[in-house]
Amino acid sequence: EGSGGSGSSGNFTTGSNIHMSSVTNTSNAGTGTSGTGNSGGGSGGGTGPGSGAIPPVTLTESLLNK
């Protein structure tokens, strides 16, 4: 489960190396909890990665501007 999550998040890692750890953590939490059968944790974690995948791009742009 963890390795699968990191693999999918690998696509986002190319966008920003710093946010890689944060994205992988959220994705692992989502897949891990869902795999465990915790629908409550799965739904919560799942929402994080999806919405979180977009903000990193804006954050990277701000860093580039600096």
From Swiss-Prot:
- Record PTM: Phosphorylated with a circadian rhythmicity, probably by the double-time protein (dbt). Phosphorylation could be implicated in the stability of per monomer and in the formation of heterodimer per-tim.
Gly residues bias locations:
32-51
Q: Which domain of life is it from?
A: Eukaryota
**Which regions are annotated as sequence repeats?**
30-31, 32-33, 35-36, 37-38
Coiled coil start-end:
none
Report the subcellular localization: Nucleus; Cytoplasm, Perinuclear region
| Subcellular location, principal | nucleus
List residues traversing the bilayer: none
The disulfides recorded in the entry are none
Tell me which GO cellular component terms the UniProt record holds.
nucleus; perinuclear region of cytoplasm
Functional note: Essential for biological clock functions. Determines the period length of circadian and ultradian rhythms; an increase in PER dosage leads to shortened circadian rhythms and a decrease leads to lengthened circadian rhythms. Essential for the circadian rhythmicity of locomotor activity, eclosion behavior, and for the rhythmic component of the male courtship song that originates in the thoracic nervous system. The biological cycle depends on the rhythmic formation and nuclear localization of the TIM-PER complex. Light induces the degradation of TIM, which promotes elimination of PER.
Q: Tell me how this protein assembles.
A: Forms a heterodimer with timeless (TIM); the complex then translocates into the nucleus.
Protein name in UniProt: Period circadian protein
**Which organism was this protein described from?**
Drosophila saltans
